[in-house]
Regions:
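Membrane-interface helix-boundary motifs at transmembrane edges
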Residues: 2-5, 53-63, 127-139, 191-203, ...
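Aromatic-anchored segments of alpha-helical transmembrane domains
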Residues: 17-24, 76, 144-159, 207-221, ...
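Transmembrane alpha-helical segments and their boundary/interface "anchor" motifs
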Residues: 35-39, 52-109, 115-120, 207, ...
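Alpha-helical transmembrane segments and terminal signal-anchor/GPI-anchor hydrophobic tails
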Residues: 196-267, 272
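C-terminal "closing" transmembrane helix and its immediate cytosolic amphipathic cap
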Residues: 254-273, 278-333
Length: 333
């Protein structure tokens, strides 16, 4: 059994930090720069799955779905119960339903990321088989086809929206998510263990493709820098390319940044990103009075989220020793 790669946990820590940074409203330039957050998390997931065998697909899909969805549902139950007792906060039925369906629209607005992980996870057995069967040229061609499919799908969405929001969001939050976010995951699968020259070649080609896309966008719109605000919802090829490139750069900088992955605090955060992410959701709202002071707000949200999860973990372990129950594992990890 392969030992846990601490640098992958470091990448997840960086990805989670970038997601939190987006939610505290940093300056526009920084908001755009850090927009590789979710692609980086998918890239790290691909690295973690690289080289693994799935003996039973049904068992894999069931256990992984429970590991992703159960903590989120437990959190949402507690979250909406807490909101119910707040006099100035009225909970709408569509907000509750949308949140439990992990939607981006008509929900609390942060749980769509979990749906991305869930959808990509459901496709993981297929992507693992493809990664093993395709040689480098075939794999590169498949990536290009996926990028084109993401763009064509985005154009299709523009035509679907006037026809009805139900169909639009159903397609947008399933097919478009899978097509787009599978790309960084596939890169993670492919480049966990490769020789340095192949990694450098892939990085160069990815950067070249990104440069071409930026030039095309600039020629068309006169502005190629607002990737997140223009091309993230729904995800388009330019946004996914930037996220994958940034993730690849961080992975290639392992020798330089590897020392950070050995810090116990970062390793702990990287192993427990889900619950820390969930705890940050109410804290984003609670820290809104800080206004434009995004850096103190980020530090406060991060530290309190981590502290709340640490308390939760200690309490769950204490209860487990006295009253073991299978549900407690989802409050722990």
């Amino acid at each position: 059994m392969r030992s846990r790669d601490e640098y992958i946990d470091f990448l997840k820590f960086v990805g989670l930090t970038m997601i939190m940074l987006a939610h505290v409203h940093p300056p526009v330039w920084l908001y755009e720069l850090r927009s590789f957050d979710v692609p980086l998390m998918l890239f790290a997931s691909g690295l973690a799955f690289s080289g693994k065998q799935i003996d039973s697909q049904i068992h894999f899909l069931c256990t992984r779905t429970l590991r992703l969805v159960t903590p989120v549902y437990l959190f949402l139950i507690g979250y909406f119960i807490a909101l119910w007792f707040l006099p100035d906060r009225h909970v709408q039925a569509d907000e509750v339903v949308g949140s439990f369906l992990l939607l981006n629209a008509h929900s609390i607005g942060y749980v769509w990321v979990i749906k991305v992980f869930l959808l990509v996870m459901l496709c993981t057995p297929v992507m693992l088989r493809l990664d093993r069967k395709l040689n480098d040229r075939q794999w590169s061609a498949a990536i290009l086809v996926l990028l084109v499919a993401v763009e064509l799908s985005g154009l299709l969405l523009a035509h679907l929206k006037p026809g009805g929001l139900a169909v639009y969001y159903a397609y947008y939050e399933t097919v478009q998510f899978v097509l787009a976010y599978s790309i960084p995951f596939l890169f993670g699968l492919r480049f966990h263990v490769v020789e340095r020259r192949r990694k450098q070649t892939a990085l160069f080609l990815l950067a070249l493709l990104m440069a071409v896309v930026l030039l095309v966008l600039y020629a068309q719109t006169g502005d190629a820098l607002h990737l997140s605000t223009r091309y993230k919802f729904p995800p388009r090829a330019a946004f996914i390319l930037w996220g994958t490139l940034a993730a690849f750069i961080l992975w290639s900088a392992r020798r330089m940044l590897g020392i950070l992955s050995r810090l116990r605090l970062i390793a702990f955060c990287g192993r427990h990103t889900l619950w820390i992410y969930l705890w940050h959701i109410p804290l984003v709202s609670l820290t809104r009075p800080l206004g434009d002071h995004w850096l103190p707000r980020l530090v406060l949200v991060w530290c309190v989220s981590l502290a709340l999860y640490a308390v939760q973990l200690s309490l769950v372990k204490w209860v487990e020793r006295r009253h073991p129950h299978p549900l407690l594992r989802y409050l722990r990890d």
